[in-house]
A protein has these predicted regions:
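Active-site-adjacent pocket-lining segments in enzyme domains
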Residues: 1-50, 54-229
Length: 229
């Protein structure tokens, strides 16, 4: 009840704007004139703009004063077609457009990472992330871009799981297991086994049978190492 309507926001009172995602952003953000004005003014004033998952929908229809699309020749990330269509095969008929397609159509250099894992792009004062598992890196990069050092914090169990899954996809099961052991040797660290297990389901949905069993093996290995610890 205390949310300020965008039309009433005095953008000059803030140093940064951060757009989070959710499917509703696909309908609410692209045509919102208040959002377009804030983003255009922030970008041209070199203020910091962060957006993650479907949050970059806020950027797709912004035109700068020079007549060029904001996204033209910008390195960006956002929820990918592959991620969208795996979860919602009929997404193209439900949503006005797919975010990846729209960003590319606006001239963006779209950077995609592994499905449902951390991927961030940083282009001057524009910081974007692919999905909800990019939120930590995007948020901390926004803080650094503002000229501050993020406060020390404990790395979450979810982040540790993301690191392990990235290691698996990029370097294989053995490297992922080595990383599991390394993380669990630090008694303060925990690993979100459920998140890793969910990626076995993603592998199955993609028809990747070996990936399914490999990731299930990682879940079992985490449990085994936790019991040893």
């Amino acid at each position: 009840r205390h949310t300020i309507p965008l039309n009433n926001v005095v953008a000059e009172n803030y140093e940064a704007v951060f757009f989070v995602g959710g499917k509703g952003a696909m309908f609410d953000f692209p045509e919102n004139k208040a959002i377009q004005a804030i983003v255009r003014n922030y970008y041209q004033s070199n203020e910091v703009i962060g957006a993650v998952c479907h949050g970059p929908e806020a950027l797709v229809n912004v035109t700068l004063d020079n007549g060029h699309a904001l996204l033209e020749d910008k390195a960006v990330s956002g929820f990918t077609n592959e991620e969208e269509l795996l979860l919602i095969p009929e997404a193209e008929s439900i949503f006005p457009f797919l975010l990846q397609d729209k960003m590319i159509a606006k001239g963006a250099r779209f950077n995609s990472g592994i499905m449902y894992l951390d991927k961030m792009s940083h282009d001057k004062n524009l910081i974007t992330g692919q999905n909800p598992w990019s939120v930590w890196s995007v948020a901390e990069t926004v803080i650094k871009q503002l000229g501050h050092e993020p406060k020390h914090r404990e790395i979450t169990a979810e982040e540790n799981a993301v690191d392990i899954l990235i290691a698996y996809h990029q370097q294989g099961s053995q490297k992922a297991k080595e990383l599991i052991e390394k993380k669990l040797n630090d008694k303060e660290k925990s690993i979100d086994r459920l998140l890793i297990a969910k990626h076995s389901i993603i592998a199955a949905m993609k028809g990747d049978v070996s990936g399914f069993f490999n990731i299930i093996g990682l879940v079992s290995f985490v449990k085994k190492m936790e019991l040893k610890a």
